[in-house]
Structure formats: C-alpha cells, structure tokens
Amino acid sequence: MKVVVQRVKEASVTNDTLNNQIKKGYCLLVGIGQNSTEQDADVIAKKIANARLFEDDNNKLNFNIQQMNGEILSVSQFTLYADVKKGNRPGFSNSKNPDQAVKIYEYFNDALRAYGLTVKTGEFGTHMNVSINNDGPVTIIYESQDGKIQ
C-alpha cells in the first residue's frame, strides 16, 4: 500500500455527484497494490495520525494533524502502482482489483477516523477533479508491505 501525504492549506475533490473539501490538513493519494492488506492500512493510518508535519514557532516539524485541528481529504489513486518498465503506456496490473481495493480503501479511512480525525473522501473508481493548495510544500510517501512500513 502506498499513500502520498501532502500538507495543504486547502484541498477539494469534485465530480458530477461529489463536492468534498477541507481547509488546513492533509490530502492523501491512496494506492492499493496487489498485496495490500488491512494490516498495511493500519500501520500507515497510525503513522499519518501521529506524523509531526506542522511547524512550531522555531520552524521545526513538531505538531501532528490533531494538534493543528486539521482535516484529511483521502483520494483513491490506483495509478500509484503503475508499471512503466516497458513501452510508453503504463500498466496497472500491480494494483489490486477494484472489488477488493475499495474494501481496503474504506477500511483505511475508517482506521484514520478511529484516531479522531475528520476524513472526507473522493469517490472510489470514478474520474474526479482534485484541487490541492500545497503548504510548504511538505510531501511524504508512506509505503507498507506485510504490515510493515518500508
């Protein structure tokens, strides 16, 4: 499982039936790979909930999202598992099939909520317009395999 965390001043995701937005917090781009499990979702959710990605008065990254009253916008993105080894068109066979991936994606979002975080989401498996106003920028990539951070 791969999650790209971007610290944002604001972010939104929209399509014909959806309009979710947050102010200060994280925009998460969430990729579910063939071997991703609920254990991977748990360890990444814990890391994100406790990650100190906001500055204190000395410009040190010392505050987590809860301490800053931030929100999370979680957007599924199967393209994080693109295979670009051959040719010019990416392949996506490394991504988990959608029926299984959506369950892990929803589980991951619920795991974040279990830490008391406000989590808004995109719509799994649909085309969306994502707007991200990065803050910093601060971008961290979390990856887990077999329930362990890589």
Swiss-Prot record:
Keywords: Cytoplasm, Hydrolase, RNA-binding, tRNA-binding. A motif (Gly-cisPro motif, important for rejection of L-amino acids) lies at residues 136-137. SUPFAM superfamilies: DTD-like. It comes from the Bacteria. GO terms for cellular component: cytoplasm. It holds the Pfam family Tyr_Deacylase. InterPro entries: Daa-tRNA_deacyls_DTD, DTD-like_sf. One of its GO terms (molecular function) is tRNA binding. The keyword RNA-binding applies. It is found in: Cytoplasm. Its EC number is 3.1.1.96. It catalyses: glycyl-tRNA(Ala) + H2O = tRNA(Ala) + glycine + H(+); a D-aminoacyl-tRNA + H2O = a tRNA + a D-alpha-amino acid + H(+). Transmembrane segments: none annotated. Coiled coil: none annotated. One of its GO terms (biological process) is D-amino acid catabolic process. Belongs to the DTD family. A Gly-cisPro motif from one monomer fits into the active site of the other monomer to allow specific chiral rejection of L-amino acids. Homodimer. An aminoacyl-tRNA editing enzyme that deacylates mischarged D-aminoacyl-tRNAs. Also deacylates mischarged glycyl-tRNA(Ala), protecting cells against glycine mischarging by AlaRS. Acts via tRNA-based rather than protein-based catalysis; rejects L-amino acids rather than detecting D-amino acids in the active site. By recycling D-aminoacyl-tRNA to D-amino acids and free tRNA molecules, this enzyme counteracts the toxicity associated with the formation of D-aminoacyl-tRNA entities in vivo and helps enforce protein L-homochirality. NCBIfam families: D-aminoacyl-tRNA deacylase (TIGR00256). This is D-aminoacyl-tRNA deacylase.
